[in-house]
């Protein structure tokens, strides 16, 4: 037989065998998860996601206020609702009503409030649905994640919540969060990275402290913490006493104070004795100075005794010395003047003079460094990353923050 003919036949035979084998390998590759990075859950801070409301009220505080709506509308953030006179309608709708008997809050009569977009990122990327820059929040971070290969609503999801309430009143939220984490684990073939900002970190600490270690080891890859008020925030005393407009110029501090007081999460974020000295004076007045041992008198003197009950309800929700039990990355801003104590010449209805300390402009350095204490209390790594000059909100778009997050997510 012709040697050349045999060689050709052998080559054809091998080719005939290799082609199906190659196709099988290609099909096998298609069945493998294409995911090469861990899924991400983003958790906002106080005021950090949209809220919607629907009205059917028995009465209103002003004739310009809507009494009934056919559908849900944006309650937060809608700058048009914060204009003079109209803001009275908004405050009456967004406030919570505290019941001392049940030790729980409820919505005002005829007001139903819901959190839009659980599992999505839109309600956290822009607080104002019109996407004005004043309401930009997680947008830059989500855009960065998309650039790294993530997809909104799929392997990067949001976990918004009713930030007016403390964790003890948001039970269904934590059930939904756990279910979403487990679903993402199954869909994308690996554990989740939690990325939280501000009060969202304390929410996640509450959540993680209540999960079995075996669950955390399976479902949580890492927890990236941005600007966490682990030990409370000094400015909370000013918020409760005389209000704080959160740098929104159209809102007067005293005007917004009623809403801020009614939010249980405000009292929850008062400074804690595991971080601050019992002797530290936070509020100075001509007649009385207030330390963290004087909260009961403080609430009585500002005419808001419900706040004392709220504090008692929430003070023990998170165990300060119990670490999260997962790999933790604490990123924190420094070098930005941060309210540390307040001097009132007329208490509590006038703006105080402010004494500043170190921090990110909102969260004091003493509070955010609480995570240092966990380095020796858990087996999982606890890393700290200082962000010099990084302000509390701006740190979400900080180049160092994004580079750090990228390393956590994409490096082996």
UniProtKB/Swiss-Prot annotation:
Location (main, coarse): secreted
The record's account of how the chain is modified after translation: N-glycosylated. N-glycosylation is important for maturation of the enzyme and normal subcellular location.
Effect recorded for residue 65 to A: Abolishes enzyme activity
Binding site for Zn(2+): 198, 355, 392
Alphabetical list of SUPFAM superfamilies matching this protein: alpha/beta-Hydrolases
Record entry for activity regulation: Phospholipase sn-2 versus sn-1 positional specificity is affected by the phospholipid composition of membranes. Phospholipase A2 activity toward 1-hexadecanoyl-2-(5Z,8Z,11Z,14Z-eicosatetraenoyl)-sn-glycero-3-phosphocholine (PAPE) is enhanced in the presence of 1,2-dioleoyl-sn-glycero-3-phosphocholine (DOPC), which promotes lipid bilayer formation. O-acyltransferase activity is inhibited by antiarrhythmic drug amiodarone.
GO molecular function: acylglycerol O-acyltransferase activity; calcium-independent phospholipase A2 activity; O-acyltransferase activity; phospholipase A1 activity; zinc ion binding
Enzyme Commission no: 2.3.1.-, 3.1.1.32, 3.1.1.4, 3.1.1.5
Mode of membrane association: Peripheral membrane protein
Binding-site list for substrate: 46, 199
Signal peptide bounds: 1-33
Keywords per UniProt: Acyltransferase, Disulfide bond, Fatty acid metabolism, Glycoprotein, Hydrolase, Lipid metabolism, Lysosome, Membrane, Metal-binding, Secreted, Signal, Transferase, Zinc
GO terms, biological process: ceramide metabolic process; diacylglycerol biosynthetic process; fatty acid metabolic process; glycerophospholipid metabolic process; phosphatidylcholine catabolic process; phosphatidylethanolamine catabolic process; phosphatidylglycerol metabolic process; phosphatidylserine metabolic process
Reaction catalyzed: a 1,2-diacyl-sn-glycero-3-phosphocholine + H2O = a 2-acyl-sn-glycero-3-phosphocholine + a fatty acid + H(+); 1-hexadecanoyl-2-(9Z-octadecenoyl)-sn-glycero-3-phosphocholine + H2O = 2-(9Z-octadecenoyl)-sn-glycero-3-phosphocholine + hexadecanoate + H(+); 1,2-di-(9Z-octadecenoyl)-sn-glycero-3-phosphocholine + H2O = 2-(9Z-octadecenoyl)-sn-glycero-3-phosphocholine + (9Z)-octadecenoate + H(+); 1-hexadecanoyl-2-glutaroyl-sn-glycero-3-phosphocholine + H2O = 2-glutaroyl-sn-glycero-3-phosphocholine + hexadecanoate + H(+)
A GO cellular component entry from the record: nucleoplasm
Subcellular location: Secreted; Lysosome; Membrane
Cysteine pairs bridged by disulfides in the record: 65-89
Its job: Has dual calcium-independent phospholipase and O-acyltransferase activities with a potential role in glycerophospholipid homeostasis and remodeling of acyl groups of lipophilic alcohols present in acidic cellular compartments. Catalyzes hydrolysis of the ester bond of the fatty acyl group attached at sn-1 or sn-2 position of phospholipids (phospholipase A1 or A2 activity) and transfer it to the hydroxyl group at the first carbon of lipophilic alcohols (O-acyltransferase activity).
Record-stated family: Belongs to the AB hydrolase superfamily. Lipase family.
Protein name in the entry: Lysosomal phospholipase A and acyltransferase
Species, as recorded: Mus musculus (Mouse)
Name of the encoding gene: Pla2g15
């Amino acid at each position: 037989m012709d040697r050349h003919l045999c060689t050709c036949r052998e080559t054809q035979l091998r080719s005939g065998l290799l082609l199906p084998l190659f196709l099988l390998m290609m099909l096998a590759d298609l069945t493998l998860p294409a995911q090469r990075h861990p899924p991400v859950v983003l958790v906002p801070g106080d005021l950090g996601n949209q809220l919607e409301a629907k009205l059917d009220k028995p009465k209103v505080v002003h004739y310009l206020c809507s009494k009934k709506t056919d559908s849900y509308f944006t309650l937060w953030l809608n700058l048009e609702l914060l204009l003079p006179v109209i803001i009275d309608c908004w405050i009456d709708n967004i406030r919570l009503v505290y019941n001392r008997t049940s030790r729980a809050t409820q919505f005002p009569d005829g007001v139903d409030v819901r959190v839009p977009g659980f599992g999505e990122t839109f309600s956290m990327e822009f607080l104002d649905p019109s996407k004005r820059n004043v309401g930009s929040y997680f947008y830059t971070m989500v855009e960065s994640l998309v650039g790294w290969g993530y997809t909104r609503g799929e392997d990067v999801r949001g976990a918004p919540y009713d930030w007016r309430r403390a964790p003890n009143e948001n039970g269904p939220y934590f059930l939904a969060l756990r279910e979403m984490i487990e679903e993402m684990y199954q869909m994308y073939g690996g554990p989740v990275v939690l990325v939280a900002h501000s009060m969202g970190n304390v929410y996640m600490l509450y959540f993680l402290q209540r999960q079995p270690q075996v669950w955390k080891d399976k479902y949580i890859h890492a927890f990236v913490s941005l600007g966490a008020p682990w030990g409370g925030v000094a400015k909370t005393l000013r918020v409760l006493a005389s209000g704080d407009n959160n740098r929104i110029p159209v809102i007067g501090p005293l005007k917004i104070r009623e809403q801020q007081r009614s939010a249980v999460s405000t009292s929850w974020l008062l400074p804690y004795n595991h971080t601050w000295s019992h002797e530290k004076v936070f509020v100075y007045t001509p007649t009385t100075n207030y330390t963290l041992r004087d909260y009961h008198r403080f609430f009585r003197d500002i005419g808001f005794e419900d706040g004392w009950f709220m504090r008692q309800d929430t003070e023990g929700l998170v165990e300060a010395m119990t670490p999260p039990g997962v790999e933790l990355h604490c990123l924190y801003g420094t070098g930005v003047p941060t309210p540390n104590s307040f001097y009132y010449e007329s208490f509590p209805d006038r703006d105080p003079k402010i004494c500043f300390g170190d921090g990110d402009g909102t969260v004091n350095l003493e509070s955010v460094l609480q995570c240092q204490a966990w380095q020796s209390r858990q087996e999982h790594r606890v890393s700290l990353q200082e962000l010099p000059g990084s302000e509390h909100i701006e740190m979400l778009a900080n180049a160092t923050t994004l580079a750090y997050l990228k390393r956590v997510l994409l490096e082996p």
